[in-house]
Amino acid sequence: MRHGKVHRKLNRTAEHRKAMFANMCAALIKHEQIVTTLPKAKELRPIVEKLVTLGKKGGLALRRQAIAEMRDVDQVKKLFDVLAPRYKDRNGGYTRIIKAGFRYGDNAAMAVIEFVDRDVDAKGQDSGPVQETSEAA
């Protein structure tokens, strides 16, 4: 019987799931919008909501808890310094999930998970390597 089993396994080991969601949390906080499969988005949402609540409460111990969960100090800094003040008057519901059709290749249901009242300029910021251009004078 499947009583009391709340979370999806997503066909991964526990360590893989934990690492994947840590990376996804960091990516969502960095870009404020990511595209993923619908089940992953549904599993990610409560993790991110709890992290934003930690950020709203503030304090060194809660900052360290967020670092332990996310493993990305720069994004924890953004969480506590930028996102937490933005949502100080909102009681939960910091993210939304929008269905985004089906993926070509395996027909997996896709979704966009994003912060409510997100900063549109944050998407794509510092993503991947940048090619250096040499100026010919």
UniProtKB/Swiss-Prot annotation:
Pfam family, one: Ribosomal_L17
MF GO annotations: structural constituent of ribosome
Tree of life domain: Bacteria
Any one GO biological process: translation
Keyword Cytoplasm: no
CC terms in the record's Gene Ontology section: cytosolic large ribosomal subunit
Cross-referenced SUPFAM superfamilies: Prokaryotic ribosomal protein L17
Cysteine disulfide links: none
This protein's UniProt keywords: Ribonucleoprotein, Ribosomal protein
Subunit structure comment from the entry: Part of the 50S ribosomal subunit. Contacts protein L32.
NCBIfam families: L17
Family, similarity comment: Belongs to the bacterial ribosomal protein bL17 family.
Protein name: Large ribosomal subunit protein bL17
Gene name, Swiss-Prot/TrEMBL: rplQ
